[in-house]
Amino acid sequence: MFFLTDPIEDRAKDWLDYKINYQATFAAQLMYPAVDTYEVMPWPDRIYQGLYQVAGTDRKERIPRDYSTQMQIMVNTLNDIRTSETQVSGTHGIGVLMANSLMFQRFPDHDGYDDPQFSSFYGQTLPLLKRGIPVELVHMENTPFGDTFKGLKVLVMSYSNMKPMEPRYHDFLADWVRKGGALIYCGEDIDPYQSVLEWWNSNGNQYKAPSEHLFEKLGLDRVPAAGTYPCGKGMVTVIREDPKHFVLKSGNDRQYFDAVSAAYRKSAGKEVELKNSFLLERGPYTIAAVLDESVSDAPMELSGVYIDLFDKDLPVLTHKVIRPGEQGYLYNVKRISGRAKAKVLCGASRIYDEKAGKRSYSFVAKSPLHTTNASRILLPKQPIRVCVNEKEAVSYTHLTLPTT
């Protein structure tokens, strides 16, 4: 799997807006420790040569040097990112079911039914995410594989915004529930796509909605009322409301969240952890995000020795504050393993031909034209001379790192 983040967007916005969104999506992709392959710049010429609006003006210009420097620093770190067994902070084991057919129902308004801005999907995920739960995405097409349900305690699903392409998926879902899983079904099953000619209403099947087939497999009535039902060692909770209403109506997600909390308590034997942030360590990299519209307005405060990778100047910090609506991407210097060896820790250029001697360290740095190179270099001792292109550097900063 490759994750794609784009330093700009197709919609017409300004450079500042692009930068804010890029930081958010970049941090989000790093929150998946099982993925370490990325597409970093779709069509680089449009990023470096395109003209886009400057915030607060009608003027358009090419990418600001501050932003191109920061962008290149961020992209270069991906060369060092590896998969890891670490987990994002928070309660794990709560998932939301999705299927390929999600894309079949993108038409926003049909026969009096609408699902604006993918609201049914976000209605299932955002009430959990905004409370600090790292909700997992479970693909219906993967249910035949046993590892799909590994570690999963609660699974939320709805057929208001997608449909099962094959009836056999219901067998795997029902088997998981009977073995102890907690399934939460949200939906009124009234969208017009319920009546399209498909397997549940053809070839001898006479189900008015695919959920009727699922509930039958679970040993329930075809159209069960709202409530919680036992099923083998597990349980099924039915909420008769389309999940889009959990986000389209202010404060309307309480019943849904309470149902998820109760199911997790029953299945896992402990409470859901509520918080307003996410934190993940991947090697020396610290990725953090603090949420707005959450359970608290408190910022996240980190102490240590960090290089700020969202800052073009790569400042070394001993204290970092991340406020609601912001993200942080830091290089934790204290996590450097082994004895200190000369190396470029981070920077806005690609590094080639590194040569480390007993008293010297050299390398070739390459980056795009009309961009600024900034680097943080780790050395075992304080340098006597620093030369760039065989000329002594006029300006550089030297910091002695603490030994503890």
Segments and roles (model prediction):
Residues 163-358, 375-377:
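A conserved amphipathic helix/loop scaffold
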Residues 397-403:
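Conserved small/polar residues in nucleotide/adenosyl-binding loops
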Residues 1-121, 224, 237-241, 246-250, ...:
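Hydrophobic targeting/anchoring helices
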Residues 294-295, 368-370, 378-383:
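Short proline/glycine-enriched turn/loop motifs at strand-loop junctions of beta-rich domains
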Residues 25, 124, 169-173:
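A general structural detector for well-ordered alpha-helical segments in enzyme core domains, enriched
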Residues 127-147:
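A short, well-structured beta->alpha microelement
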Residues 387-391:
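Short strand-turn-strand beta-turns centered on an Asx-Gly dipeptide
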Residues 150-155:
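Short acidic/histidine-rich motifs immediately flanking catalytic phosphotransfer sites
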